[in-house]
Each structure stands twice: as structure tokens, then as C-alpha cells.
């Protein structure tokens, strides 16, 4: 059945199904769908979906986040707009604010995911896990090609595609170096008809 703790608000368009429990002081909705979900105290789930997963206390989900089965999201976490999490564990204090996919991953405490981060978990034959240590900083538009481990306190430069493990406290840069071709545009200008 469904259980809702004292002081929690269910806003319009919210649907709770299966064995779903909502802690005390939560705000769920508007337009949220939770099925077999366990939500901790003082957590907000705004216009998002949570399936067969657990969310800790004082965590903010959404808007427009999709928490797929098998996920455990800790406390004091931000899962923002257009973030999808599948079969992953996210430790306390981590921020995944927008436009990110975290699948088949184990994420440490106090990590920061830049916009457009993707854990690339499937090679057409098998799904692999990504492990991210505590206090890691992942720059925008990063691809993490699993299986891969990101060490504690490491940084990943924006635009990187990571294929090898990153040691703790290291900076990983995995992108092509920019080249500027002087006067290229002038030489290749489209002639008006």
C-alpha cells in the first residue's frame, strides 16, 4: 500500500502506486508519478517519475527527472531537470543538476556532474558499471565509457571522453586540441546567386 508521512503535501496530478512510502515534510508534485518508491523526510519530487527506487532525506528531484528501477539516491542530493538515473547508487551530497544520464553506476559523496554528462554503459552485448569516487568533479559534456573508475577528488575537463581509469586527485583531459584555420571562412565563402 501507500503511506504518506505527517506534513507532506501531494500536489495536483501526483500518482502514488504499489508499495510507496513518503516521509514527513515532503512535497510531491505537481505531476509526479511514484511506483514502489521510498522517499525520505523533507524531500521534494517535482514533476518527476520514480520507479522501484529509494530516495534519502532533504533531497530535491526534478523537475522532469526519471529515476528508473534499482536506484538508491542518498540524502542532501540534487537531481535536476532532464536527469535520468538507472540501477545506480548516488551517495550523499552529490549534485546532478541537468541533462545527464547516470546508468549502472556507483557514485561517491559530494560529486558534481556537469551538464550533459553520460555514463556510457552498453556496448551492444553487455552492460558495464562506472565507479565514481568521493568529491569528483565531472565537467560538462563528458562521456564515461564503462567499465571505468574515476578516483576520489579527481577532475574531468569539459568535453572529455574518458576510456581509462582516473587516479585520485588527478585531472583528466580527453578531447581533441582546437585548431583555428586563419581566413578559412573568407576563402570558402558561399557566393550569392
Locate the predicted segments by residue.
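Short, charged, intrinsically disordered terminal tails
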Residues: 181-193
